[in-house]
Amino acid sequence: MFTTQEITTTHRHYSYVEQLMHSAFPENERRDDAQQRKLTDAQGKFRCALIQTQYKEPAGVITYWKFADFTYIEHFAIHPDHRSQGHGTQVLAALLKEWRHPIVLEAEIPALVGDLAYRRIRFYKRLGFRICRMPYWQPPYRYGDGWLPMKLLMLGNEPPRRIVDEIHWEVYGVKNSRLMKR
């Protein structure tokens, strides 16, 4: 049995969260540590949750944004020691039951990244997510980085453009993202 616990940077396992984020996500798919810590401690719409075993040992992390009418999963990672055993499915399925719909997340395009991205998308599809038809670009986390072509996945109906605009503004600080040069 795995559980989640919302944490701040003062939690004794926060360094574990940072290390897992570094190993699970390339630099251009996560913000720098100082920005991440600031968001984690702000306790606004952003949440950082430690995934724990039944013995309270750290096993993963999920970061997400709770908006008025949807939830955006920004990062989800299970430690390699706990992967391929159904633990990620168990954790995410439990969260999906308690969160309001729609739920949105981004995933790499398999043709650009390879087999891992393909397996990741299959994982989300098994949980009921659908790939959205609209083209999607993830804004850069850092000045000077480029926009990343991604797939937008949704549990619920196809997201209106307003949801994408809200994610771009609240998460990435980009207003009028449709006008931005990619």
Name what the model sees in each region:
Residues 1-34, 149-150, 162-182:
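Short amphipathic alpha-helix that is part of the acyltransferase structural core
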Residues 23-53:
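Active-site rim helix/loop that mediates acceptor-substrate recognition in acyltransferases
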Residues 46, 147-152:
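Short hydrophobic/aromatic beta-strand or adjacent loop that forms the aromatic wall/cage
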Residues 48-50, 56-65, 70-77:
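Conserved beta-strand in the GNAT
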Residues 78, 84-98:
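Conserved acetyl-CoA-binding loop-helix of GNAT-fold acetyltransferases
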Residues 99-116:
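Conserved GNAT acetyl-CoA-binding A-motif
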Residues 119-145:
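Conserved catalytic-core motifs of GNAT/GCN5-like acyltransferases
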Residues 152-159:
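Conserved beta strand-loop-helix elements of the APE1-like EEP
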